[in-house]
Amino acid sequence: MPELPEVETIARGLNRRVAGDVIESVWLGSKPEPLKSPATKIVNALESRRIAGVRRVGKHIVFDLENGGRPALTARKGQAGKSARPTRSGAQWIVHLGMTGRMLVCPPDAEIERHTHAVAKLASGRELRFVDPRRFGRLSVSSGFEAAGSEPLEVDLASFVVLFRGRKTPIKSALLNQKLLSGVGNIYADESLFRASVRPRRRVASLTRDELGRLYQAIREVLKEAIALGGSSISDYVDSDGEEGSFQLQHRVYGREGQPCLVCKTPVKRVVIAGRSAHYCPKCQK
């Protein structure tokens, strides 16, 4: 599943390419799974809207929309709803990529891939296409979408300590709790815990303030490095231009079960914590 760095990379690419463009028409596929909001509501909220900007909120891509677009084009065959000009402002198109979702900017003559669930035709002639083979991704509209938890790159150390201090769950599980930190997943939790020298099974309450401080810094460092390298391309992840990231080449423990630790040469271990895999070095992490 794309995590914070991958979603940030995609959102930045989309903002660079489509901010200021106008959504003229929207086509939605027949599969109901990707639609978290009713199809007609999505179409009516998007058509004739100008894309004010694209940003990341947690693991979601948020298209901020505003009025003032040109009249919508005639609906395509299969379109789920009629063209309409929304009267309210501040609408948002929310995209969660799920496990295999991709949000691509394509020329209109590009072949439409199998598993394409949404196409937004833009005034510039290009198309925004949502492709998701496994259909765990979600499309919705909102007017005030916010992340459930704190943003890892925005929260300060004192607030971070307050969020985690005293919890009885394993630290790996706490890092994956989107109501605490929004956007961190398996990859970056494992990599951050390694850099902080903390084992994933440790109960949060057992961590000292110094250890929480190291973890806070490690999370920020790992996420910033991953964003700079375009994220980790594992399985299907590509950015909005169809390009892969390269942070997977920098992974120190994630996905390296049985391989020697890059620091001490001890074989990396994999354990399951609350149904989720965790990778760690039994010597470097305490």
Show where each model-derived region lies.
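Gly/Gly-Pro- and Ser/Thr-rich, intrinsically disordered tail segments characteristic of DNA damage-repair
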Residues: 1-77, 81-135, 154, 209, ...
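Phosphate/anion-contacting hairpin/loop surfaces
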Residues: 89-195, 203
